[in-house]
């Protein structure tokens, strides 16, 4: 994997979202460097604003590598279908030169020379990466790790035990929703796919318009990508939201690359954003007790739990389509309690 190689051997900056990555590369260019931005095409939408209003406006060229999940003619997950169909067209609409990177090393070397010439002339260039263009590359750990022994599956089991007719569960993008599905698939579960970082915004919109209780199960990477929503939630203070963050200091579903969460005090941030009750928990028992207390006396609450990296082997994916997940979830959310 190209990102793993870059982390191992290059001056790599782990941005929290693709738009920030583009802006950071642009700053490096202004410092006289030749920056490269790496992203999955599902995040290309996040990069549109700086690519069109920063790079194009200020004539700051960057080199980009973007994957092609959902490439037409290939089988992929449903959340990649639309972006896969429009990835290259979107680059063209932004007046960005692009090519598919060849799997042949000789041809690819010539492509890189060509791209450098275009960038030298002040124009950005993106390589679109088809599946299997790069081989596997092991990630060398280069950040300090934490000794954490509780895993996500254990915590999710504790959380989902608190199911009720007036409780909705929102599972963030990646392994969280997949594990929730395997533990207990319910019509009041929303399994987010794609839209990384948007789970808390989704829950906010529902919670402000429903009396049902919303339990958000978030991750460190997801929260960091859209951390501004903590302030929005804190401002509107919906009492029926319980926001749980499971922090494994990694992007687990994309290969375990580190996040920048290691030295962040999310509990204090949530408190300063206006959450009424903010607690760090360290074991399953305290998680169970905290949920029991919240269900009895709902108030805007933030729970933070450090967990270990990794998930169960051969983890499956929800067999219920996103469309059906949305429909049954809406039906449940609008069902009147007896």
Per-range role (PLM):
Residues 1-92, 96-203, 208-212, 260, ...:
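Thiamine diphosphate
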